[in-house]
Amino acid sequence: MTTETLACTYAALMLSDAGLPTSAENIAAAVKAAGVSVRPTMPIIFARFLEKKSVEALMAAAATQAPTATSAAAAPAAGEASGKAEEKKKEEPEEEGDDDMGFGLFD
């Protein structure tokens, strides 16, 4: 993501949070106040996109589609538990196999 895109995104989020309209003029003013220079078309593109969908609707959609931390953490934990059980099963036959090899280094 470019600096221009991030600046316009943060400006739109800030304007929405403040309850101000996300017009091209407001986005351009917020970006200019932040000291970031963007192409003149960037605020227009963002404003036209946000005419069709509000920032709140986009944030709500992102929140419902994002995986939760608990489900993401639970899946690897379950995989690790079964993986550890499999490792223990695999280790036991190897230990028995070492005794039967008959190397006898310390006998």
Swiss-Prot record:
- Show the ranges annotated as biased composition (Basic and acidic residues): 83-92
Listed GO cellular component terms?
Answer: cytosolic large ribosomal subunit
Residue ranges, compositional bias (Low complexity): 67-82
Is Ribosomal protein found in the keyword set?
A: yes
Q: Which UniProt keywords apply?
A: Ribonucleoprotein, Ribosomal protein
According to the record, the signal peptide region is none
What Gene Ontology biological process does one annotation of this record name? cytoplasmic translation
Query: Any idea which GO molecular function terms this record carries?
Result: protein kinase activator activity; ribonucleoprotein complex binding; structural constituent of ribosome
By its UniProt entry, which InterPro entries does this protein fall under? P1/P2_N_sf, Ribosomal_P1/P2
Keyword Ribonucleoprotein attached? yes
* Pfam families with a match to the protein in the record: Ribosomal_60s (PF00428)
The segments labelled Disordered in the record are 67-107
| Family classification | Belongs to the eukaryotic ribosomal protein P1/P2 family.
Listed under subunit, the entry gives: P1 and P2 exist as dimers at the large ribosomal subunit.
Give the protein's function: Plays an important role in the elongation step of protein synthesis.
Please state what the protein is called: Large ribosomal subunit protein P1
